[in-house]
């Protein structure tokens, strides 16, 4: 395994801005697909996350008509940097996104979405085109939001998606945060568990070379390593690509029910001992990965392992 503390070239997620500028690419959020939002909420609240109210998602009609139902709805756990999203199909809907979500749940419950944020959505669209991803038309996603003073507002995102077969690992997308100040409101950011930032995600795949190369073309960022574990460092955040054997080395006890599999999300704690104490008092067990990183089992985190690391460690590690 790499000497994680020697990874000084990597900027800790909590030290980076909330949204990128120029050609920078950040890991914006990751998403769970779930069949039961109530059960999910109980699980995540036990881990110390505050969840936003459930909202059915809508796309803006390009012809100026009423909003178009996306077929899915979400709740979010906002962090000081990045966030976690939890999605379920809206009952009675039949849309491409609801069908994709239900098909993914047939494979496994857990992480199925990774979203990168950019500043230049038009430039990112052209990059996806030139990379051979045949991106779909940009989606102007809107959802209502209640502000801290009780007034209503609307948050906006420009989302770039590609046909599902282009990125079979899950719903992999680019987006521009049009209203970041509304998305990251201070009163909805949980602090009791000490977790402050989204650091990365670990994917278990059959062909590490092919998948890492494809994600490199998708993001425009380079790959480290050439074996059965490789990594891709963004301007904020990192992805790790592991074979089944590499997953067993890095995350003992975590097994992929199928491949491809988004195995773990990595979260930075501002004070690991505080996080560990909070989880222990909540009845959630953790196992040590190092002196500066702990693991929450998928059983306790709605199907995905959660790695919590502090400022002296970096997860996923650089290959």
State the predicted function of each range:
Residues 57-60, 69:
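Membrane-anchoring hydrophobic segments
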Residues 2-28, 32-52, 68-140, 147-227, ...:
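Glyoxalase I/VOC metalloenzyme domain signal
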